[in-house]
């Protein structure tokens, strides 16, 4: 009986040599914009399994179609927040909104052309109408932003009061941020925190 099992195993190994097995790149089939239209409640930004951050674009901070902060049909941009729920159908998080702007072009700082937007596994980019290119990626615990400005002048707006509100009327203001602080460390570093109160405590 033992010899029979060894022969069967040997025959199977001959049929499927281990050297012929190659790793496949299945991430080429992933389309991050699926579910970002209508009531799909997803966003196209990068994320990691069980990650602490999900950086991405925020078009609006309230309403049923914007529970992840993003809606594919929109071309208005509030900025790029660092956390969100994707696919749950509930507005939540949207913490620490950043908006890079070109101060020489006031028009276009909050809008973009859909043809400039792209996403793939672990990466999102868009070029705003003021010429600023935004690229996002992340690790398990850190969101990385890279901004490319068309001129020698660059500004980044930091909004610690922003959050994805679980309301359907923009006039139904609900305070999400309990406490916040931001400190400019140097020309390349800011630090801070915000403590929020919403569905997730």
Give each language-model segment a name.
Residues 24-201:
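Accessory carbohydrate-recognition regions in carbohydrate-active enzymes
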Residues 1-24:
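Bacterial Sec-dependent N-terminal signal peptides
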């Amino acid at each position: 009986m033992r010899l029979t099992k060894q022969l069967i195993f040997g025959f199977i190994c001959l049929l499927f040599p281990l050297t012929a097995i190659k790793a496949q790149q299945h991430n080429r089939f992933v389309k991050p914009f699926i579910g970002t239209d209508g009531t799909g409640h997803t966003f196209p930004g990068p994320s990691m399994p069980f990650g602490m951050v999900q950086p991405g674009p925020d078009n609006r901070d309230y309403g049923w179609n914007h529970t992840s902060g993003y809606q594919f049909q929109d071309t208005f941009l509030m900025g790029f927040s660092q956390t969100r729920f994707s696919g749950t159908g509930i507005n939540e998080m949207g913490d620490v909104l950043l908006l890079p702007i070109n101060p020489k072009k006031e028009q276009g700082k909050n809008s973009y052309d859909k043809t400039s937007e792209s996403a793939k596994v672990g990466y999102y980019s868009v070029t705003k109408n003021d010429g600023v290119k935004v690229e996002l990626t992340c690790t398990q615990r850190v969101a990385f932003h890279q901004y490319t400005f068309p001129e020698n002048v660059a500004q980044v707006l930091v909004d610690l009061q922003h959050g994805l509100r679980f309301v359907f009327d923009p006039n139904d203001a609900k305070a999400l941020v309990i406490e916040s602080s931001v400190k400019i460390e140097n020309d390349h570093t800011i630090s801070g925190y915000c403590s929020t109160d919403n569905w997730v405590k």
